[in-house]
A protein has these predicted regions:
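Conserved N-terminal Rossmann-fold NAD(P)-binding element of oxidoreductases
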Residues: 4-9
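ADP-ribose/adenylate-binding Rossmann-like module
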Residues: 83-101
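N-terminal Rossmann-like NAD(P) cofactor-binding module of classical short-chain dehydrogenase/reductase
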Residues: 66-71, 91-93
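NAD(P)-binding Rossmann-fold cofactor-contacting core
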Residues: 27-41
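Rossmann-fold NAD(P)-binding glycine/threonine-rich loop
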Residues: 95-117
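Rossmann-like dinucleotide-binding core of oxidoreductases
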Residues: 113-187
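Hydrophobic/small residue at the entry helix of a nucleotide-binding pocket
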Residues: 11-13
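Rossmann-fold cofactor-recognition segment
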Residues: 44-55
Length: 188
């Protein structure tokens, strides 16, 4: 089974990462601060290891057919995707497709590789967990087609400290400003 290489353990990364590990996937977790990644995964049982993040570390551990998931700031995505292409590994991120990322598409296609971006809402991969919650409800003993529910996601945090954006900056402020110009609707 291919290894999943998970880059970054920020606030939006942990639920999806835990789900992969708990479902039996082999994962190498890369983080700038190893102790923070270990703390974030405390109590999680499964096949994973934590190593310091660097492009060189990903190059050392990733192999052909592996999957690299980048939850890093957007400026890392293109260099990581380029590395993935050179290693014959697949790449996934939650970020919007930049022109530089779009330019990598033909090289990936020629090698039969997937470069998957814009997974779900930005910050993306974490929000796929909402689909898992809906599915758990549908499979539960309390599910009924007659029930009516709503689900609202703000894709971030409401700030305890008032600011002009009414937003808690827990990820890239530039990313927050860019996402503010886009709209998204999801029907679950």
């Amino acid at each position: 089974m291919p290894t999943i290489h998970w880059l970054g353990t920020g606030l939006s990364a942990i639920p999806g990462l835990k789900k992969l590990i708990e479902n039996g996937h082999s994962v190498i977790v890369y983080n700038r601060t190893v102790d923070k990644a270990i703390e974030a995964l405390s109590g999680v049982d499964g096949d994973y290891q934590v190593v310091p993040f660097s492009i060189e570390a990903v190059k050392k551990y990733a192999s052909a057919g592996d999957l690299v998931v980048s939850m890093l700031p957007g400026n890392f995505h293109v260099p990581v995707a380029e590395l993935c292409i050179s290693l014959d590994a697949h790449f996934v991120s939650s970020s919007y497709i930049s022109d530089e990322m779009r330019d990598l598409n033909s090289a990936a296609i020629k090698k039969g590789l997937c470069l998957v971006n814009e997974v779900g809402l930005d910050p993306g991969i974490d929000h796929s967990m909402s689909h898992a919650l809906v599915q758990e409800y549908r499979n539960s003993s309390v599910f009924s087609k007659e029930n009516s529910h709503s689900f609202l996601s703000y894709c971030g945090g409401l700030s305890d400290i008032p600011n002009d954006f009414c937003y808690k900056f827990s990820w890239s402020p530039l990313g927050v400003l860019k996402i503010g110009r886009a709209s998204c609707r999801e029907r679950v």
